[in-house]
Amino acid sequence: MLALKQALSLVSTKVAGGAAWTPTDEGKLEAWYENKVGITRNGSTVSDWADQSTNSRDMVQADATEQPAYNTVTGDLTFDSSNDTNLQTTSQMSFSADFTLGIKMFPTSTNGTFVADNTTANELFKISADDAITIKIDGVTAILSLDTGEFDDDYIVLTRVSDVFTLYRNGVAQSNPQTLAGTIDIDAIGIRRTDVNGFDGTIQEVQIYSISNATLTANINARLSTL
């Protein structure tokens, strides 16, 4: 794993002037919920995770009983399905073409939705098994499985290029791409419509783009590997 992280750090593209890549370098960045940044706390929980893109799609939760817990050291947001903890934005994101989602998370149970829509039904990304992610778009389902092992404290990238989804786990593309067309709708972290299939575990960062290419995937992997 150390060798993998070192290799990924070497592929991180530099922008003009020699600065390290960040998601805001991408013109097609739709939302960025950055680790340890943009957090509004309500005691030990999070009421607002501010979007670090220019789109102001903050993820918020006014109900204190549904706010995820926050770890000030790691930047972990802990979600608990028994309390329906979640964050939502009023600015729904919709993607009918290429798409990339990067996330650093540690699921502790299955059937948990990490990113989805709590306004439109049948739109979700969830941990459906110890080794599988289910994607549902416009009510149609695809399942992306790991080649080996089970989900743990991982950084995950999901790409869609010409309607073909690929799952990357800790920088490694898994060998079971799936075809799934339709319009992806997203407005929530940790829950789907209506307030079901809540996520159990921690989430450190979420990045969402309306584009996908190999360089972007490498850069996301390189960044998430450092968290």
Identify the meaning behind each predicted range.
Residues T134-I156:
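Short, aromatic/His-centered strand-loop micro-motif at the edge of beta-sheets
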